[in-house]
Curated annotation (Swiss-Prot):
Positions bound to Mg(2+): 53, 96, 128
Binding residue positions for 3-methyl-2-oxobutanoate: 53-54, 96, 126
Descriptive protein name: 3-methyl-2-oxobutanoate hydroxymethyltransferase
Active-site residues, record numbering mapped to chain: 195
Necessary cofactors: Mg(2+)
One MF term in the entry's GO annotations: magnesium ion binding
Length: 277
């Protein structure tokens, strides 16, 4: 057990996120899909870890987020929760509700949200949509399950939109999105992700809502920011969207390490006497 794991920090809750917004403290969010990465993120002080349906892309290699299932996300979430618990236990863990796990009916959504919460003790679930899911958000929150909303570009609706372009540039769509944000708050959502919308609109929504806004490609005036951890670490050399800041080039580092390992094995340089029993 490391030193950090012996010094448990105050766990981030929905109330803590609300207080951070009121105090002008920015909220940091990253995705994670496994135990090891979750330990690193929690140790580094991340506020929220999102077990995103983006695992469908970056972990499983699918072109969209649609194929991933509830059970697959639960598998990822179990490792993430254990990783956080092994370190400071500070980070909140939010799990995406995957495509078609909440669209059929509020009752079906509640059943799936309850399964996600019960099987690995995460803190909340996240759902895409505005007024169309208002009754579902209300049903789930009334059952005691915190819900994070998601507006703007909604990857689960990619075939409806036809592209990953910026959303709500049209004034009419911007007004609808603003109304969706207000509806989510009134329905009980504790926060809302704003993805790929104009920075000015995101700033307006952030001022209007009392709950935190978490931006991804939505400007600096959101109450927090979320990115995919693989992107900030430079693990995907083909993916460089404008809204991502790359903090490392681990793709190159890992490739070089593997090449050196292969060379050492082939040359007989590994293992050495010191690495043998």
């Amino acid at each position: 057990m490391n030193k950090n794991s012996q010094q448990k920090a105050a766990h981030v809750t929905t109330r803590r996120l609300y207080d951070m917004k009121q105090n002008g403290e920015k909220i940091s969010v990253l995705t994670a899909y496994d135990y090891t990465m979750a330990r690193i993120l929690d140790r580094a002080g991340i506020d929220v870890i999102l077990v995103g349906d983006s695992a469908s892309n970056v972990f499983s290699g699918h072109n969209t987020t649609l194929p991933i299932t509830v059970d697959e996300l639960i598998y990822h979430a179990k490792g993430v929760v254990r990783g956080v618990q092994a370190e400071t236990s500070r980070a909140m863990v939010v799990v995406d509700m995957p495509f078609m796990s909440y669209q059929l009916s509020p009752e079906d959504a509640l059943r799936n949200a309850g399964k996600i919460m019960k099987e690995h003790e995460c803190d909340a679930v996240k759902m895409e949509g505005g007024r169309t899911i208002a009754d579902t958000v209300r049903r789930i929150t009334d059952a005691g399950i915190p819900v994070m909303g998601h507006l703007g570009l909604m990857p689960q609706s990619i075939y409806k939109y036809g592209s990953y372009k910026v959303r709500a540039e049209d004034p009419a769509e911007a007004e609808e999105l603003l109304e969706d944000a207000v509806t989510l708050e009134r329905s009980g959502a504790f926060a809302v992700v704003l993805e790929k919308i104009p920075a000015g609109l995101a700033a307006e929504i952030s001022r209007l809502l009392s709950i935190p806004t978490i931006g991804i490609g939505a400007g600096a005036e959101c109450d927090g920011q979320v990115l995919v951890v693989n992107d900030i670490l430079g693990l995907n050399r083909e993916f460089h969207p404008r809204f991502v800041r790359q903090y490392a080039d681990l793709n190159t580092v890992i490739e070089q390490a593997v090449r050196q390992y292969v060379e050492d094995v082939r040359s007989g340089g590994f293992p050495s006497v010191d690495e043998s029993y």
